[in-house]
């Protein structure tokens, strides 16, 4: 007990020296949090020190591994499984772009396990908007898993799948600032997708998150941050990418002006309240909505389609995503998910 009690101040001291924790140390720390072994005052100091130093890939990977193991899920026996969950928190108030992308990718015949939550920032989260459109967030875990085979997509409402994380809620509420927990959500999908597209709220997180995905054993992934400040690829400025493929991470820049896309500022992508965001999502998935709304979904879907191996390049992905949106197939997927989880 004394040895464990001594560990937490040691980790704090290491972080205050601006030295990152190893994966093993990060695992120890997360286990300590989940089992209420770390004193509150030390926990707050550790979270602040992590944030001030800048979270590392080893810290993210170690913590995520523990949280994923502690979830109620287990790997699905599928060779290809995609998630499009981002960090959120960019403050831009866009409509639910990555949620729309999930249904486009599913309509392309790729199994999708969308992991998400309600918004923590007063905006509209993926869970909020899908619930407004009829998705049952309280479906039994077995039914949520079965939807992947039956519908081609499912939605995992994070709080139902991560009961162990209740232990850290008090720290997050008390601090009221960003912490490492804002980054862990996309890394801990309980159904273990092997391919991911993750938007992050700050450019410096792109290589860090991509390396964390490599350490966690993902096959292919793209981490992105638009220079407009979005955790999505935007239509006005280039987007910085961290691409994981073949066990290596490389950086690349995606310029929307290289493609036949509607140039549009962030303001053209903004949502509103819950009803407004639900209406935009429904319109876009049915092939209507504003051109900029459709194009930003097509662009981001292209990244996911390429990660999934469904298209050879982003241009082909944009074209396929546009066809899917125009056909209403993505809306059909949503309706099938609503009906399946309601039964």
Swiss-Prot record:
Its cofactor is Mg(2+). Mg(2+) 2 binds at residues 231-232. It comes from the Bacteria. 5-phospho-alpha-D-ribose 1-diphosphate binds at residues 86, 89-90, 94, 96-99, 114-122, 126. It holds the Pfam family Glycos_transf_3. Keywords: Amino-acid biosynthesis, Aromatic amino acid biosynthesis, Glycosyltransferase, Magnesium, Metal-binding, Transferase, Tryptophan biosynthesis. Pathway: Amino-acid biosynthesis; L-tryptophan biosynthesis; L-tryptophan from chorismate: step 2/5. It is an enzyme of class 2 (transferase). Its EC number is 2.4.2.18. Mg(2+) 1 binds at residues 98, 232. Anthranilate 1 binds at residues 86, 117. This is Anthranilate phosphoribosyltransferase. It comes from Synechococcus sp. (strain JA-3-3Ab) (Cyanobacteria bacterium Yellowstone A-Prime). The lineage of its organism: Bacteria, Bacillati, Cyanobacteriota, Cyanophyceae, Synechococcales.
């Amino acid at each position: 007990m004394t040895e464990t009690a001594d560990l937490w101040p040691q980790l704090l001291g290491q972080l205050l020296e601006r030295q990152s924790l190893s994966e093993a140390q990060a695992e120890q720390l997360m286990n300590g949090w989940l089992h209420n072994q770390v004193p509150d005052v030390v926990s707050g100091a550790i979270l602040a020190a992590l944030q001030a130093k800048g979270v590392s890939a080893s810290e993210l990977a170690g913590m995520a591994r523990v949280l994923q193991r502690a979830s109620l899920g287990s790997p699905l026996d599928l060779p290809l499984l995609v998630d499009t969950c981002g960090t959120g928190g960019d403050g831009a108030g866009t409509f639910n772009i990555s949620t729309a992308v999930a249904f486009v990718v599913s309509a392309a015949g790729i199994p999708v396990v969308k992991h998400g939550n309600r918004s923590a920032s007063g905006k509209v989260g993926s869970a909020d908007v899908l619930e407004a459109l009829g998705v049952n967030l309280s479906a039994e875990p077995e039914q949520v898993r079965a939807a992947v085979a039956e519908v081609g997509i499912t939605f995992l409402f994070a709080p139902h799948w991560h009961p162990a994380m209740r232990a850290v809620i008090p720290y997050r509420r008390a601090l009221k600032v960003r912490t490492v927990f804002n980054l862990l959500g996309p890394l801990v999908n309980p159904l273990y997708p092997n391919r991911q597209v993750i938007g992050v709220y700050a450019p410096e997180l792109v290589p860090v998150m991509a390396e964390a995905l490599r350490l966690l054993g993902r096959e292919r992934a793209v981490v992105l941050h638009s220079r407009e400040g979005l955790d999505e690829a935007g239509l006005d400025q280039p987007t910085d990418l961290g691409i994981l493929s073949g066990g290596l991470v490389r950086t690349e820049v995606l310029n929307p002006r290289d493609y036949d896309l509607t140039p549009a500022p962030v303001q053209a992508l903004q949502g509103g309240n819950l009803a407004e965001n639900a209406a935009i999502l429904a319109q876009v998935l049915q092939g209507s909505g504003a051109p900029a709304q459709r194009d930003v979904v097509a662009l981001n879907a292209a990244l996911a389609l390429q990660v999934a191996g469904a298209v050879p390049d982003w241009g082909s992905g944009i074209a396929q995503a546009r066809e899917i949106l125009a056909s209403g197939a993505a809306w059909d997927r949503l309706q099938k998910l609503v009906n399946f989880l309601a039964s």
